[in-house]
Structure formats: C-alpha cells, structure tokens
Amino acid sequence: MIRTTFNKLREVKDSLPHGSMDAIAAELNIAADDVRDFFSGASKMDGYHLEAGPDGGIVVLENSAILDVALRLAWAAKNAL
C-alpha cells in the first residue's frame, strides 16, 4: 500500500512526456481515461482512496501499477533514455 499526496501525483503527471497517458494505458491494458482519472483525483478504480489532508489530500493506493509506470517514464524522460 502506497500513501502519497494528491499534489505529489500531479507533480508526477506534470513531469511525464507527451503521450504518456496512452503509453501507460497500453502497457497496463486499461483505458487511457482511467489513467487520466487516476491523476485528476476522479478515479473510481478499486484501491484508490482520497482523503482530506495537506497538499491536496492524502491518496492511498492499494495497487501502484499506474504510478510505477508513470515514475519509470518520468525518470526516463528526465534522463533522456
């Protein structure tokens, strides 16, 4: 289980290169809208819990697959791999 803040998720989203939402969706075999919803706080996915708190709220993720792929893509873009 991963705990982070909504603002941290937005930072990850903002660091992703163009087309990443579709790339994440394709890799995980899910809809691109589900990936967009994940980063917008509108996610209805099981295991995504948003609570009031600092930095836009506390997000608890039971499944971090979208975040894991996003962090890998952001790291690769930052390091030009």
Where in this protein do the model-derived segments appear?
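Short Lys/Arg-enriched helix C-cap and helix-to-coil transition segments
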Residues: 46-81
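Key DNA-contact positions within bacterial/archaeal DNA-binding proteins
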Residues: 33
